[in-house]
């Protein structure tokens, strides 16, 4: 027997030019999923050169899907690959096929173990009290998730795992919500000291809605409640210097942390909604296509250098290439957005796509979502009571669009899935 093994080894050595060829084993594949690039970075161990034919990298996208080849690599020294353009909240599986020759026999294929993962995958969902209709949310520096809705004049609080921490009441009156490009409900913002600011509107029978705002400290102590200038408060945001800005229908108001009015700025007639700060810039969703003579034919996310919204420094979104266009980067009915300044990403909640659209460096990066009530799906369209007459406060049930999104310091994303009455949390 030892004689036969020796003969076999000598034959293999002769077939390889006199060199003793090491045994070839199945490759070991590793993967790192990078949401900032919407990519999977793959690497594997190098195969001994004399018997190498090719690596074949395969991917299966989605549960129950078959593997398909995405790359064939014919250099044994090339042991890395990047699969870009990944969709969010999708399950990806990869495997590596090693094609190698065998002296005196037919070539063979060795298959690695599978690696799997994804970006922005669903982590958890939790429901709100019946009829709450969550539509705005924010996360403070301690990881407390604050949620405001169209159905109650209070703020619900949760930890990042969805455990209820109790609610803070705003007023004994009834909320006034306004149908604009998105449903205007109580607006939320936090400062670096974890104080919460809530700007909201209350119905008064036979009168215009009353706008006011409340400041809570991080323990829930109501510090003050003051009336607001202007007509119908729609957004509140705190800039990096701690200045507070509240947007009404036609003006932007600046306040200090004590609630004192500092300045007011007239807003251009261009339809816009939402307000967040991005690297100190005033970022809003703009709907110029609502003007028949506008140059843009679809909404944009625009960051302006100042409160007057005169100079745009960043613009995200594009016009449709055709009436049937539904491709990446085209915003249809954006509702809210969150930003990641470190990687220059914007996460736009878009009812037109029933999901989240992500931009990086002003360019489309990825997206995910679909309409429905199963986990990971969204319902941003539904019925809510809205003010029809700002002079009298008269209200009626209407079909509206609503939804909100926020990001915590670790990169997790929280979506207010309004008409499924729940919050959905997605991974970084």
Language-model region placement:
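Eukaryotic scaffold repeat domains enriched in small/polar residues
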Residues: 97, 107-428
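Solvent-exposed loop/turn segments flanking beta-strands in beta-repeat/beta-sandwich domains
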Residues: 47-66
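Short S/T/G- and acidic-enriched coil/turn segments that sit immediately N-terminal to beta-strands
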Residues: 77-82
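Predominantly extracellular/luminal cell-surface or secreted proteins
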Residues: 58-62, 99, 426
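C-terminal motif of bacterial Sec signal peptides marking the signal peptidase cleavage site
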Residues: 11-12
